[in-house]
Structure formats: structure tokens, C-alpha cells
């Protein structure tokens, strides 16, 4: 009998497959395609301190092997989630990973307190947000700010805190080390790569916001490389994501160092992607006589 259970930050996941925040709504939207209980856990849509309507359309643009998005964190706000959505999700046999974004350290701390009083299993902190008190620079690009933010939020969180890293940095390992030093329980990566698509007839960007985050298979090699580098640099467990489309992709991320792997853009193509992914992982384990999925984490051998 093979074991696919993963202990991540003290939380047991029945399998290593989760969803990337922003690609799975609040889970219930996918119930007509597949039960959310098929997943070890899922990343809920990103939350902010107050409700947000998001950016003006167009907000999505298809690209070769991926999509660009600038949805702008449209969401009902953390308090609405805590009072009206999480009680419903708590009835499902799966772990909920709440994702939060803030404009100030104080906002992050307030949201951590609110989410800590719910049944979420893990709090994921998106640091790819502008710090309005420091000229709008993104939180996740400065190691000192990442350390300060993580340390502050950790004091207000009763749940394991996972910091979501941006790939749009000079050195992702330095950011990872800063989050670890600040007290993070785990890390997730990668967030989207910044990109642009221009209409050659109008000479204007397709997206109303001009730029957006690139996701999908196009980013997978970058994500795998960054997972490997961060796994070598810190001792924290990792959630890997970026262009996962099948079971082989999941295995590749785990070999690079991820303990959990998130499906994201692939769900827009195949909403029930979790089903063939789980089957392919099972077949891989049987083929190579792997009894425990944990045994392959971070075992890729460099040349």
C-alpha cells in the first residue's frame, strides 16, 4: 500500500495536490466538475482587508502556453470570508489555505488575526503587493522588508504562516532566507511572472492595466529552477506551482524540493485535472516501487 500523505507545517494532507490561489475560487465553484475533497487542500481566492472589485476589463489575455491576468484581487473581503464562506468550507474533508494580500504591515496583521479565528488550516501571505507606506515598492522585493513583515504577521497568527514568493526579484533565495529568518513556517512559489501583450493593430496593450501576471506551462522551467534553489537555501517546506498540467509535472516539482504542488492555470483547461493527476502519480509510484511519496522530495541529482 503506497502512502501519499504529506505532513506540511504540522498539518496532514491526504495527498500532495493543492490548488493555487486565484484559480479555484472558493472551491465550491468547481463542485459540479469534481469534489474539492479530491485535493489534499486548496488555496482559496486571495483576500484583502476590505472588499475589492478588481481592475477594469480586459483582465485576461491568452498567450502561447499560458495566460496573462490582471484581475486585481477581486474578492468579498476577509471578514465576509470568515463569517460566511469558511463555515461552509469547514464541512469538507480537505484543508483550506487562506491567501491574504495587504497594503501595509498593519493590514496583514489584522487579517492574520481574523483568519486565525476560523477553521483555515494554513495562512498564505502574498507579498507581491505594493507597500503604500514605502513609496509603493512591492513588499516581496526587499529582504529586510520581507523579514520585518513576516516577523510582525507571525506574532498575530495562530495558524502556520506560508509566505508566497514572487519570481520578479534579483535573488529569490535571499527573499526566502529573509522569510525564514522572520519566522515563516513554509514558503510557496512561484507567483506569476510580469508580462505584457500588445495588439499590433491598435498598438495598445490587450490588458486594461497594461501588464499582468503570466502563468501556465510557459513558466514551469523557471518555477522548477526556483524551487530547487530555494530548497537548497532554506530548511522550510515548500509548495511548488507554475504550469503544472499533469502528474509528471507534480513529480518534477517534488524532485526539485516541493512537499506540496499546486494546480493552477491547468484548471481552466481541465477543471477535473486532479483526477488524472492523481492516477498518474499512482502509476509512477508503482512503476518505480515507491512506497512513500515523501521519499522523493528534493531527491533530484544534479549533474
Mark where each language-model region is.
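N-terminal capping/small domains of soluble enzymes
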Residues: 1-96, 102
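C-terminal helical cap(s) of enzyme catalytic domains, especially alpha/beta-barrels
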Residues: 36, 54-64, 198-212, 254, ...
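Short gly/pro/ser/thr-enriched loop/turn and capping motifs at secondary-structure boundaries
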Residues: 48-53, 130-132, 194-197, 268-270
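Short donor-sugar binding/catalytic loops of nucleotide-sugar-dependent glycosyltransferases
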Residues: 244
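Alpha/beta enzyme core
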Residues: 103-239, 248-256, 260-263
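A short, charged, Gly/Pro-tolerant segment at domain boundaries
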Residues: 294-303
Amino acid at each position: 500500500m503506497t502512502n501519499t500523505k504529506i505532513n506540511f507545517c504540522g498539518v496532514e494532507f491526504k495527498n500532495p495536490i493543492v490548488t493555487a490561489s486565484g484559480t479555484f475560487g472558493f472551491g465550491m465553484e468547481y463542485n459540479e466538475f469534481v469534489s474539492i475533497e479530491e485535493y489534499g487542500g486548496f488555496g482559496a481566492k486571495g483576500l484583502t482587508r476590505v472588499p475589492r472589485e478588481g481592475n477594469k476589463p480586459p483582465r485576461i489575455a491568452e498567450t502561447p502556453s499560458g495566460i496573462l491576468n490582471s484581475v486585481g484581487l477581486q474578492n468579498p473581503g476577509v471578514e465576509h470570508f470568515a463569517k460566511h464562506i469558511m463555515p461552509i468550507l469547514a464541512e469538507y474533508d480537505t484543508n483550506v489555505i487562506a491567501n491574504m494580500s495587504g497594503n501595509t504591515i498593519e493590514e496583514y496583521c489584522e487579517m492574520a488575526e481574523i483568519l486565525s479565528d476560523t477553521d483555515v488550516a494554513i495562512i498564505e501571505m502574498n507579498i507581491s503587493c505594493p507597500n503604500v507606506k514605502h513609496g509603493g515598492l512591492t513588499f516581496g522585493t526587499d529582504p529586510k522588508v520581507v523579514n520585518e513583515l513576516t516577523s510582525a504577521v507571525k506574532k498575530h497568527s495562530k495558524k502556520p504562516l506560508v509566505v508566497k514568493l514572487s519570481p520578479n526579484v534579483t535573488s529569490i533565495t535571499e527573499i526566502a532566507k529573509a522569510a525564514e529568518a522572520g519566522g515563516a513556517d513554509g514558503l510557496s512559489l512561484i507567483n506569476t511572472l510580469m508580462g505584457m501583450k500588445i495588439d499590433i493593430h491598435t498598438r495598445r496593450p490587450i490588458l486594461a492595466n497594461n501588464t499582468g501576471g503570466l502563468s501556465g506551462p510557459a513558466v514551469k522551467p523557471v518555477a522548477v529552477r526556483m524551487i530547487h534553489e530555494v530548497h537548497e537555501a532554506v530548511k522550510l517546506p515548500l509548495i511548488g506551482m507554475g504550469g503544472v498540467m499533469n502528474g509528471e509535472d507534480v513529480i518534477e516539482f517534488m524532485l526539485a524540493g516541493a512537499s506540496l504542488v499546486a494546480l493552477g492555470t491547468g484548471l481552466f483547461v481541465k477543471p477535473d485535472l486532479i483526477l488524472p493527476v492523481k492516477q498518474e502519480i499512482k502509476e509512477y509510484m508503482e512503476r518505480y516501487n515507491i512506497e512513500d511519496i515523501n521519499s522523493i522530495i528534493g531527491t533530484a541529482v544534479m549533474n
